[in-house]
Curated annotation (Swiss-Prot):
GO terms for biological process, alphabetical: 2-oxoglutarate metabolic process
Family in the record: Belongs to the class-I pyridine nucleotide-disulfide oxidoreductase family.
PANTHER family linked to this entry: DIHYDROLIPOYL DEHYDROGENASE, DISULFIDE OXIDOREDUCTASE
Disulfide bonds: 75-80
Pfam families found in the cross-reference section: Pyr_redox_2 (PF07992), Pyr_redox_dim (PF02852)
Protein name: Leghemoglobin reductase
Binding site for FAD: 66-75, 84, 148, 177-179, 347, 353-356
One GO cellular component term noted in the UniProt record for this chain: oxoglutarate dehydrogenase complex
Lineage of producing organism: Eukaryota, Viridiplantae, Streptophyta, Embryophyta, Tracheophyta
């Protein structure tokens, strides 16, 4: 079967309601008369557990297999959730230590209780994993704890965590095994001196110095956590920029913000050697283009150079499932592989490696299996970096729009002109909107702000429904709110900003340029 390219990964289907009803009825009847499952999901992460619950809700007999022993995958256990817990706790500490006095709050001393911080994180994770198990019981999803691998296209052998083995049969088997930390040549992760994101979430003491290899989402977030708690953080990145998927203008402001917080960057740099023989770690660095080597000493190294699909040991070769050069499973617009009855979703297939994308994959895949309509548009999946400030974006960057040759307009609004931001003394950042010049259709939205991860969803809805910047601008936004900056940027996009804001924009633009030049000169 010919596989669809990533550019075609927009899942659409047109199936009549009568056909859907007949198909679903037949599946229900089959489930009630056989031990075979209608759907088997390998992997209990965001994509897998959501797919399993949705399948059961659609009347399909469903089993989910998870090797970890707790549901939620990397995201819930050692990723999204624990990192956000530590980001919030470290932010509260940093605010208490550095910002409370500005608001008239005086503290005699502020100390970090790292064990308490970790306990709060672990409690959040535990409650949420138990919550998913509760959802499985409520929705009658059979849950098998163990490592599953194919023995045939319709059978999965599971080595259970209690030492046993069982074979799970299914008419439709969904691979949702997620991704794993990408290793670097010559850099061995021991989760002590050289840690992955998993180890960085469980350090027992605050390192004096931390080197982060990789300037992506995970590296910058974890670097922020330990930087706020007192670590001297240096980020080493092979590329010329941090977060390459980010709009260039926003990225530059974002990097300046992180540098003001004390984070150091060594871009266009590669790690060519690691020495852990002493008390700390000595990294041998070299310019990406080649050149003189330097030594960087640190206490802990966080390897955050991306993730790789977890497809090894699943028996894919045995049943003939096709993968690409980096072991991503190839699927068509219905998430089916080249093997009939076998599907794949989430991080193991092409597309953004994001938990919410995996969830959408899971729902759409199961809807297709049930004869319904599934839909995922990867061009409209929002991304968020949960630092302070946060950076969120959806749609295209200005660089991507230029590359397409589309005539466009840009509207911007700085938070330094937003009433709520000024009132809470947190006015760093901006909203940037890109819209097609002729139609005013929104092409992309980029936000750098304290709560950009929440603000971005107004833009996500707008893109999903092909809205114009004027559509957003004509929506009444409550005052004073941070969301008014989105409205103002939308008004600026179609050239109708509030008259009193024009002078504000001009004044603050000039001030911003002056501060930039002064800062660069001072440095």
């Amino acid at each position: 079967m010919a596989m669809a390219s990533l550019a075609r990964r927009k899942a659409y289907a047109v199936v009549s309601s009568s056909r859907s009803s007949v198909f679903l009825t037949s599946l229900r009847g089959f489930a009630s008369g056989s031990d075979e499952n209608d759907v088997v999901v390998i992997g209990g992460g965001p994509g897998g557990y959501v797919a399993a619950i949705k399948a059961s809700q659609l009347g399909l007999k469903t089993t989910c297999i998870e090797k970890r022993g707790t549901l939620g995958g990397t995201c819930l256990n050692v990723g999204c959730i624990p990192s956000k817990a530590l980001l919030h706790s470290s932010h509260m500490y940093h605010e208490a230590k550095h910002s409370f006095a500005n608001h008239g709050i005086k503290l005699s001393s502020v100390e970090v209780d790292l064990a308490g911080m970790m306990a709060q994180k672990d409690k959040a994770v535990s409650n949420l994993t138990k919550g998913i198990e509760g959802l499985f019981k409520k929705n009658k999803v059979n849950y098998v704890k163990g490592y599953g691998k194919f023995v045939s296209p319709s059978e999965v052998s599971v080595d259970t965590i209690d030492g046993g083995n069982t074979v799970v049969k299914g008419k439709h088997i969904i691979i949702a095994t997620g991704s794993d930390v990408k290793s670097l040549p010559g850099v061995t992760i021991d989760e002590k001196k050289i840690v992955s994101s998993t180890g960085a979430l469980a350090l027992t003491e605050i390192p004096k110095k931390l080197v982060v290899i990789g300037a992506g989402y995970i590296g910058l977030e974890m670097g922020s956590v330990w930087g706020r708690l007192g670590s001297e953080v240096t980020v080493v990145e092979f590329a010329s920029d941090i977060v390459p998927t980010m709009d260039a203008e926003v990225r530059k402001q974002f990097q300046r913000s992180l540098e003001k917080q004390g984070m150091k960057f060594q871009l266009k740099t590669k790690v060519v050697g690691v020495d852990t023989s002493g008390d700390g770690v000595k990294l041998t660095l070299e310019p990406a283009a080649g050149g003189d080597q330097t030594i960087l000493e640190t206490d802990v190294v966080l390897v955050s150079a991306g993730r790789t699909p977890f497809t090894a040991g699943l028996g894919l070769d045995k049943i003939g499932v096709e993968t690409d050069k980096i072991r991503r499973i190839l699927v068509n617009e219905r998430f089916t592989t080249n093997v009939s009855g076998v599907y794949a979703i989430g991080d193991v297939i092409p597309g953004p490696m994001l938990a919410h994308k995996a969830e959408e994959d899971g729902v759409a895949c199961v809807e297709f299996i049930a004869g319904k309509v599934g839909h995922v548009d990867y061009d409209k999946v929002p991304g968020v970096v949960y630092t302070t400030p946060e950076v969120a974006y959806v749609g295209k960057t200005e660089e991507q729009v230029k590359a397409l040759g589309v005539e466009y307009r840009v509207g911007k609004f700085p938070f330094m002109a937003n009433s709520r931001a000024k009132a809470i003394d947190n006015a760093e950042g901006l909203v940037k909107i890109l819209a097609e010049k002729e139609t005013d259709k929104i092409l992309g939205v980029h936000i750098m702000a304290p709560n950009a991860g929440e603000l971005i969803h107004e833009a996500a809805i707008a893109l999903q429904y092909d809205a114009s910047s004027e559509d957003i601008a004509r929506v009444c936004h409550a005052h004073p709110t941070m969301s008014e900056a989105v409205k103002e940027a939308a008004m600026a996009t179609y050239d109708k900003p509030h008259s009193h804001m024009k002078s504000w924009l001009l004044l603050h633009s000039l001030l911003f340029i002056f501060v930039q030049q002064f800062t660069m000169t001072w440095r």
